[in-house]
């Protein structure tokens, strides 16, 4: 009897481990300034690159905190919709977690979604996450002409990093799958009982078998940063715990400049003399100096900045 109980317990543990699967981890560990299509993402609609690599975000106790860089969604061409694939899921739930900083939002539009297989004929962008000009987060199952997105009343802080979790649940039957959205300002290892927003499919779009995540830009004045994307079949795997680094993560570039950020500071490592220019989002030059090779620290307020060197231009986030 004891052996039978042990075997049953081991079988249950094995099944539980098999059911809890990490499908995708994207920490944007690429060179700053690189377009996503050079980093394993696919854009099939021939849009102009509007999403590139910037320095990353931090959210205490989250597994993606402070690893690699981040993706800056900033551009007017909404046909540039980089996709990244994961293993097709046909049952259960898919959880997508990511860090978000909505620094500038000038137009209501969706910036993130799921979809099924990539196709140039079907546009099944499902589980669309929106931001509007009031800095409120919203959700729709499918396109707004079928059903307007639903927005939460909370106004997000442009200088705060949030953890967003999208849950897609596949339910037996046609056009009845459900999406749930969670917005966290502090880490929790347990799935909240009540989501922030929840929608059941009542649109013209068929339910999908998710196998891609999609980023989307819609306005050149928007500055939205996404980082630390985790796709999994359980909350515990998608919203896994981690430790933020005690120092900033170095961001190598394609010239002789390496940088990292810490709260309200930019740190540079130069291998040759370099003229450094920093501009805020209004275009005002807030720092200009020719610096010798070596290490340099520049104090800055929170916000987005354009870092210009003699060879390249980088968009950076100071938290």
Report residues per predicted region.
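Extracellular glycan-recognition surfaces and repeat-rich motifs
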Residues: 34-70
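Residue-level detector of functionally pivotal "anchor" positions at catalytic/ligand-binding pockets or at interdomain
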Residues: 237-265, 274
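Extracellular carbohydrate-recognition regions
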Residues: 19-47, 244
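C-terminal tail/sorting-segment detector
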Residues: 2-3, 302-319
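Short, aromatic/His-centered strand-loop micro-motif at the edge of beta-sheets
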Residues: 140-162
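Secretory/extracellular carbohydrate-interaction modules
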Residues: 65-136
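Carbohydrate-binding surfaces in secreted/extracellular proteins
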Residues: 28, 98, 159-199, 229
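Flexible glycan-contacting loops in extracellular carbohydrate-active proteins
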Residues: 191-225
């Amino acid at each position: 009897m004891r052996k039978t109980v042990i075997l049953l317990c081991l079988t249950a543990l094995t099944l539980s481990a098999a059911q809890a699967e990490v499908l995708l981890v994207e920490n944007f560990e690429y060179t700053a300034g690189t377009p996503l299509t050079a980093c394993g993402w696919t854009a099939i609609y021939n849009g102009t690159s509007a999403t590139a690599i910037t320095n990353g975000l931090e959210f205490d106790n989250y597994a993606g905190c402070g690893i690699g860089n981040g993706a800056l969604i900033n551009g007017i061409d909404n046909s540039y919709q980089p996709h990244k694939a994961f293993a097709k899921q046909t049952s259960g739930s898919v959880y997508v977690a990511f860090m978000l900083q909505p620094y500038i939002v000038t137009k209501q539009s969706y910036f993130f979604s799921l979809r099924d297989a990539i196709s140039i004929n079907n546009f099944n962008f499902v589980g669309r996450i929106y931001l509007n000009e009031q800095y409120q987060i919203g959700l729709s199952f499918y396109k707004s002409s079928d059903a307007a997105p639903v927005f939460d009343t909370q106004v997000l802080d442009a200088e705060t990093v949030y953890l967003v979790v999208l849950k897609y649940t596949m339910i037996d039957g046609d056009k009845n799958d459900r999406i749930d959205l969670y917005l966290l300002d502090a880490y929790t290892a347990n799935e909240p009982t009540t989501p922030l927003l929840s929608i059941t499919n009542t649109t013209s779009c068929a339910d999908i078998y998710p196998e891609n995540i999609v980023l989307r830009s819609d306005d050149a004045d928007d500055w939205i940063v996404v980082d630390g994307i985790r796709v999994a079949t359980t909350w515990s795997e998608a919203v896994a715990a981690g430790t933020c680094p005690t120092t900033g993560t170095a961001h190598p570039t394609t010239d002789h400049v390496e940088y990292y950020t810490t709260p309200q500071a930019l740190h540079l490592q130069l291998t040759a003399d370099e003229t450094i220019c920093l501009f805020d989002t209004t275009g005002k030059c807030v720092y200009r100096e020719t610096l010798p090779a070596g290490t340099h620290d520049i104090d800055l307020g929170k916000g987005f900045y354009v870092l210009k060197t003699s060879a390249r231009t980088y968009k950076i986030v100071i938290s």
